[in-house]
Every structure is written in structure tokens, then in C-alpha cells.
């Protein structure tokens, strides 16, 4: 006999994610922690407590923290015991064996006793109930047993929590009328859906995150929510921009568009873009089997509203005139082609002639392969312009490395700043993890290319969060002799 602890929640097939229940579920409560294979339940082990529902009479979406749809809860192996606890603290051991038609409950309860009596009646009489929700095919013994279990629980919960019939999916199959959602704390699950759901639990069971099937739901509601790629928490999209694309749950810095970064750094009304009409002409006539290079450029222009993977211009930062270039990873991975290199070079030359400080915000996968050696020469061209700017004119260049900064950008102007600033958690490398592992046939340790690791190796200067970045830049400029045009 194998025992499992379940964090069981009821959800409808139509509302299987984040639904609220309209009535207090006094008879049905929340289970508790993982038994770790022990035969004796540890009811009061707070370290293994997952979640509890409040005793209030109504429930909103916030009361149901985790839903993970499972199409067939009876696909678990037979001869199982699962343990539940109601809102009054009473615990029950429920055992059912589908093959031998056994259903037992170890404690007297109105909810579970009614279920047990229903099953006993079914076993003794071999006939289905008159309830309209029990209308299942009874010709196959195993099929009818499975569906009778489902329909009994379905019917009881309908009456207990006052769920109207219109919520039902309308299917004639009882097993489709409701979906019982389980988050299992066991080491393995036998079932058809268990393989498609990647569930991770921490040591105390308080942080359970489903990754696989949740992505489809998140895509459906991506106009409302932004999912953190670190903790998988959801952030309300309407307020996400005002939070500087920082996850409210874990503080992780998510990617920002170039326009959002300009709005974050530049004083309102002072932004003056440069070379906006400069576009690539496909210099080597690169054509792939999937999509021609020109067509790909056009599609990214429509998608992002940008002409290229970098925006350059002049503006003011806390009243200090600056020249700034911001790369956008959403445009072909921020790859550096001839247009990107030319725009950055012109920006540096303009700043050299006007004696302006330069900021470059890097977010790139490296040189653009569709332009061949012309993209590689941009590294030398930008570095040459920076040499004149820094060494001859003695001006101040700040490089800001965001996630990801790799390839040719890392090998050129990304690492040439007088001050090199990195964002928290930024992925910074010359060759990416996948490229290194495929080339050298060696495993790259996790975190070895993160900003925090590189910082301790002396690769750059400070790690600055976004909410402090503008103030830090302002102090750096004033320290190097660049002051606001108007004193407050």
C-alpha cells in the first residue's frame, strides 16, 4: 500500500485556473505535508504544511493559491491511501482499491460517511444512483467504478458548495464534469498527465510551482499578467512598467525594451533621437531556407516599432546633457549588424565633438551572422571611435551591461567603459553556455556567467539595481565634471 499526501483543490474544467468558490467549505478542508514515505501521518508538522483555507464564509481568487489541471484523477495506481484534513482539524485516511472495489474511511464524518455509504450502496446493489449527475456508462465494470467514484464526489460537492449547473462543461461523461486538481508531494506519480507537468517543491512544501501546463494559461492571459522567469510569479502588467520590470515577488530584473529604458533614464521632454531612418540593405544578400533576411528585418520592424536593434540620441539625465545608445534584445536578439555599428559610431563621434558623456546600454547576442564580416568589423570601428573619445579627448564613457550581453558586444564596446555597470542577475558572457558545452563537450556550472559571479572576479565595477541607476549615473557624471545645465 502506497500513501500520498495531497494538496487537493476542486476546480471546474471550464475554470480550472484561479476560480473562487461561493460558499464556505466547512466539510472539505486542506491536506497537509508530505509523509516522506512514513506510514504514520504527521498532522501537526508545521514545517511540512502546504496551505490552509481561511474559515471565512466566502472565498476569492486569493484563497486558492495553486491550481494544476489533471484530466483523470483515477489514473493513479490502485491500492492507494490518501490523507485529508477538514477545516475543523479532523484528519481522515481514505483508502480505495479500484481493482478490488474497496473504499474505506477511518473517521466518522458527514461528508466522508455519505461518500462511503454511496460507494457501499453501489457495491451491494451494482446499480447507479438516480442523481442526474450519475448518468454514466455502466457496461464496463472498471469504467463504471471509476466514473461512479467521480460522480459521487462530484454530486456531493455540488450540493455542499452551491455550484450552479451552468458551470458544468456540458459533457455527458461524468468524469469530464469536474477536474480534481492535485499537487502531489510524492516522488512519482502514475498517471497520463503526470509526465507533462513539471512540479517543483522546496523543503517545507510552501512553494510549489508548476511550469509546463501553466505556460498555456499564461499565454492566454499575457495581456493581463507578466510571468517572472525566475520565480514564475505573476505580475500585473498594468503596474509592471511603473515597477521598472522588477518582479514584485522575488525582485528579479526582467528584460526591458529600449523605449522603456530611455523613458527610465532620460528626463521627460529632453529626448532627441538620432539616425532613426537608417536601415540595413542586406549587404551580402543573405537568404536562408526559412525566411529571407530583408523579410525578417521587416517582420521585426513591425513587431517592435523600431528600425534597428539600437536606439541612439541625446537627452538630459537629471539636467545633465548626455549621449546615449540603448540596445533592444527584442529586435533580432539585439544582434550587431552594420546599421547598429554605424549608429553607435556616429553617436560617439557626435559626443566627441560636443564633449558629452556617453552611456551605452548593452543587450545583445553578438554579431549578426546575416551580414557576415561586415558585422564583425563593427567591433573594430566602434572601438576605434571610443579610443579617440576616451584617450584623446579624455571624455567619460559608461557601459551598462544588462541581460543578456554576449558575443561581439562583450568583446568590444561592452567592456571598454571607464565605468562598467551591471544589472542584478544579468547574463554576461562572451560565448553562451550552450555554445561552450557543444564546442568543448564540458558542462558549464550554473551561475558561472551571472553578474554576481563575474563581479567577484573583477570583471566590472558596481552592480546597480534599476531603481537606483539614474541617481548613481548622476553622481558619477558630477564626479567627473559634468553638471546640470540649470542648478535647482
Swiss-Prot record:
<comment type="pathway">
    <text>Lipid metabolism; malonyl-CoA biosynthesis; malonyl-CoA from acetyl-CoA: step 1/1.</text>
</comment>
<keyword id="KW-0934">Plastid</keyword>
<keyword id="KW-0547">Nucleotide-binding</keyword>
<dbReference type="GO" id="GO:0008270">
    <property type="term" value="F:zinc ion binding"/>
</dbReference>
<feature type="binding site">
    <location>
        <position position="228"/>
    </location>
    <ligand>
        <name>Zn(2+)</name>
    </ligand>
</feature>
<dbReference type="InterPro" id="IPR034733">
    <property type="entry name" value="AcCoA_carboxyl_beta"/>
</dbReference>
<dbReference type="GO" id="GO:0016743">
    <property type="term" value="F:carboxyl- or carbamoyltransferase activity"/>
</dbReference>
<dbReference type="GO" id="GO:0009570">
    <property type="term" value="C:chloroplast stroma"/>
</dbReference>
<feature type="binding site">
    <location>
        <position position="250"/>
    </location>
    <ligand>
        <name>Zn(2+)</name>
    </ligand>
</feature>
<keyword id="KW-0479">Metal-binding</keyword>
<keyword id="KW-0863">Zinc-finger</keyword>
<feature type="region of interest" description="Disordered">
    <location>
        <begin position="189"/>
        <end position="211"/>
    </location>
</feature>
<feature type="binding site">
    <location>
        <position position="231"/>
    </location>
    <ligand>
        <name>Zn(2+)</name>
    </ligand>
</feature>
<dbReference type="GO" id="GO:0005524">
    <property type="term" value="F:ATP binding"/>
</dbReference>
<dbReference type="GO" id="GO:0006633">
    <property type="term" value="P:fatty acid biosynthetic process"/>
</dbReference>
<feature type="binding site">
    <location>
        <position position="247"/>
    </location>
    <ligand>
        <name>Zn(2+)</name>
    </ligand>
</feature>
<keyword id="KW-0150">Chloroplast</keyword>
<dbReference type="GO" id="GO:0003989">
    <property type="term" value="F:acetyl-CoA carboxylase activity"/>
</dbReference>
<dbReference type="InterPro" id="IPR011762">
    <property type="entry name" value="COA_CT_N"/>
</dbReference>
<dbReference type="GO" id="GO:0009317">
    <property type="term" value="C:acetyl-CoA carboxylase complex"/>
</dbReference>
<dbReference type="Pfam" id="PF01039">
    <property type="entry name" value="Carboxyl_trans"/>
</dbReference>
<feature type="zinc finger region" description="C4-type">
    <location>
        <begin position="228"/>
        <end position="250"/>
    </location>
</feature>
<keyword id="KW-0862">Zinc</keyword>
<keyword id="KW-0443">Lipid metabolism</keyword>
<comment type="similarity">
    <text>Belongs to the AccD/PCCB family.</text>
</comment>
<dbReference type="InterPro" id="IPR000438">
    <property type="entry name" value="Acetyl_CoA_COase_Trfase_b_su"/>
</dbReference>
<keyword id="KW-0276">Fatty acid metabolism</keyword>
<protein>
    <recommendedName>
        <fullName>Acetyl-coenzyme A carboxylase carboxyl transferase subunit beta, chloroplastic</fullName>
        <ecNumber>2.1.3.15</ecNumber>
    </recommendedName>
</protein>
<keyword id="KW-0275">Fatty acid biosynthesis</keyword>
<keyword id="KW-0067">ATP-binding</keyword>
<comment type="subunit">
    <text>Acetyl-CoA carboxylase is a heterohexamer composed of biotin carboxyl carrier protein, biotin carboxylase and 2 subunits each of ACCase subunit alpha and ACCase plastid-coded subunit beta (accD).</text>
</comment>
<keyword id="KW-0444">Lipid biosynthesis</keyword>
<keyword id="KW-0808">Transferase</keyword>
<dbReference type="InterPro" id="IPR029045">
    <property type="entry name" value="ClpP/crotonase-like_dom_sf"/>
</dbReference>
<feature type="domain" description="CoA carboxyltransferase N-terminal">
    <location>
        <begin position="224"/>
        <end position="488"/>
    </location>
</feature>
<dbReference type="GO" id="GO:2001295">
    <property type="term" value="P:malonyl-CoA biosynthetic process"/>
</dbReference>
<comment type="function">
    <text>Component of the acetyl coenzyme A carboxylase (ACC) complex. Biotin carboxylase (BC) catalyzes the carboxylation of biotin on its carrier protein (BCCP) and then the CO(2) group is transferred by the transcarboxylase to acetyl-CoA to form malonyl-CoA.</text>
</comment>
